[in-house]
Amino acid sequence: MPTIRDLVAAIRRRDGIDAAVVLGRDGLLIDHQADASVNAESVAAHVPSILQYAEDLGASADRGHLLTAVIEYRSGSAVIAAMSADAFLLVLVRPTADLGALLFDLRRHRANIAALV
């Protein structure tokens, strides 16, 4: 059976991925693989506040629980995907990456990913 480490490694092998990070709702790292230029602990520490605001928005807009958030920056994107109520996957993506394919795969394999936690 695949593990969280296998998931992180598989995502990291995709073209254009700078980091794949699995973290708890509290922002603490569970597992990660990242380029040397990415401070995974620092990046993960910012995710809980983003999650809180995104979930508040979803509640106010009557959209339900957060499944995936995509934040686009000038130099790439950050994708945050819920693995369970207490674990999240953060993927840092370069502009050259196939973001659509990544999002499709995360959605298609959501149940399998959730089973890893």
Where are the model-predicted features located?
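Non-catalytic interaction/Regulatory regions outside core domains
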Residues: 1-117
